[in-house]
Design a protein with these regions (language model features):
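Catalytic helix-loop patch of NAD(P)-dependent Rossmann-fold dehydrogenases
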Residues: 83-126, 133
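N-terminal Rossmann/SDR dinucleotide-binding element
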Residues: 1-45
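SDR active-site strand-loop-helix element
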Residues: 11, 49, 75-81, 126-128
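NAD(P)-cofactor binding segment of oxidoreductase domains
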Residues: 37-77
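Conserved catalytic-core motifs of eukaryotic protein kinase domains, centered on the activation segment
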Residues: 21, 56-59, 86-90
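NAD(P)-dependent short-chain dehydrogenase/reductase
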Residues: 113-160, 167
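Residues at the starts of beta-strands that form the adenosine-phosphate
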Residues: 5-9, 74, 122
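Non-catalytic, hydrophobic alpha-helical segments
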Residues: 168-172
Length: 174
């Protein structure tokens, strides 16, 4: 979706299939400093959707915030609707106060709060619901359950939001 319109670069850690692509950089969130990659690429926009240990990601985002404060660069942080997971039975909106009971939601809140030191024009927080894709683990799990006739657990009276990987990339583009 984005490739025809922008010079795109990415990072990988365990997906070695990207190692031969010149627009991908090896980056281990636990051992490497993200600024090494950022200073090579000199991006105008960083889309942050890292995986890895929570504290290593928090440290990475501290480096990114410091960089963005001093350079012509913006950050789109891919967060999660888990920042509202304490509110099970009604919808939450972007202006609502975050409150999470899960470690994952609290971790995302910690990074979101670190971004508040930036000028509002320098960052966007995209709080994603469950994201499904053709080869996503959640999709594969549901397909396997349907194929085997295994019941799929549902949660009545709970608001659930979902999107697809393709719809997400379209929305990032616009």
């Amino acid at each position: 979706e984005l490739y025809p319109y922008f010079n795109l670069f990415g990072t990988y850690c365990s997906a070695s299939r990207f190692s031969k692509q010149k627009n991908f950089f090896y980056y281990d969130v636990e051992d490497d400093n993200v600024l090494t990659v950022v200073k090579k690429v000199k991006p105008q926009l960083i889309i942050s959707c890292l995986r890895g240990p929570f504290e290593a990601q928090v440290a990475c985002h501290k480096h990114l915030v410091d960089y963005i404060q001093n350079f012509d660069c913006r950050l789109m942080f891919i967060s999660s609707t888990n920042v509202f997971d304490a509110f099970e039975h009604y919808a939450s909106y972007e202006i609502d106060k975050t409150l999470s009971e899960s470690p994952y939601g609290r971790f995302k809140i910690k990074i979101e709060n670190s971004l508040l030191s930036l000028a509002p024009s320098k960052y966007v927080i995209a709080r994603l619901p469950m994201v499904f894709g053709t080869n996503a683990p959640r999709t594969k799990e549901i397909e396997a359950q349907v194929a085997s006739g295994t019941p799929i657990e549902v949660f009545p009276n709970t608001i659930v939001n979902v999107t697809s990987d393709r719809k997400l990339s379209q929305q990032v583009h616009y």
